[in-house]
Amino acid sequence: MERTFAIIKPDAVERNITGKVLDKIEGAGFKIVGMKKIHLTKNEAEGFYYVHKERPFFNDLCTFMSRNPVVVLALEKENAIAAWRELMGATNPANAEAGTIRKDFGVSIEENTVHGSDSPESAAFEIPYFFSQLELV
């Protein structure tokens, strides 16, 4: 079994659709092995998105991700990373396939409901950024 990391972003939490997103996750066969609702500080968001620090959207992304609470998740499934990326859909909800989370719930490229690890290396950094081994079941 492979693990991946996911965030239900502030836009989704603000719109009270966390439960709908979780239903899609579990309905797709993912096991939630870690979950908590947190409010990131700007510094925590900057540390998490450090790989994007030179990108022009970095500051706006960190401000957005720290504006309100998020739900962080560790997910488990065969080929979890690829399966989660497929369920999320394209970054831009307008380009996402029907039935994906971003197509169903996303508002814009920034407010696209969810984040997900894009590689095993990313998951290996992202999961322990938010979860200790004791919190993963």
Swiss-Prot record:
Transferase among keywords: yes
Reaction(s) catalysed by this chain's protein: a 2'-deoxyribonucleoside 5'-diphosphate + ATP = a 2'-deoxyribonucleoside 5'-triphosphate + ADP; a ribonucleoside 5'-diphosphate + ATP = a ribonucleoside 5'-triphosphate + ADP
Matches recorded under PROSITE patterns: NDPK, NDPK_LIKE
Cofactor requirement: Mg(2+)
Alphabetic keyword roster: ATP-binding, Cytoplasm, Kinase, Magnesium, Metal-binding, Nucleotide metabolism, Nucleotide-binding, Phosphoprotein, Transferase
Alphabetized CDD domains for the sequence: NDPk_I
Record-listed ATP binding positions: K9, F57, R85, T91, R102, N112
Enzyme class: transferase
Keyword Nucleotide-binding attached: yes
GO cellular component, as recorded: cytoplasm
Active site: H115
Cellular localisation: Cytoplasm
Superkingdom per UniProt: Bacteria
Main location: cytoplasm
SUPFAM superfamilies: Nucleoside diphosphate kinase, NDK
GO molecular function: ATP binding; metal ion binding; nucleoside diphosphate kinase activity
GO biological process: CTP biosynthetic process; GTP biosynthetic process; UTP biosynthetic process
EC number: 2.7.4.6
Pfam families, per database record: NDK (PF00334)
InterPro entries with a match to the protein in the record: NDK-like_dom, NDK-like_dom_sf, Nucleoside_diP_kinase, Nucleoside_diP_kinase_AS
Similarity remark: Belongs to the NDK family.
Function statement: Major role in the synthesis of nucleoside triphosphates other than ATP. The ATP gamma phosphate is transferred to the NDP beta phosphate via a ping-pong mechanism, using a phosphorylated active-site intermediate.
Record note on quaternary structure: Homotetramer.
Protein name as it appears in the record: Nucleoside diphosphate kinase
Organism: Geotalea uraniireducens (strain Rf4) (Geobacter uraniireducens)
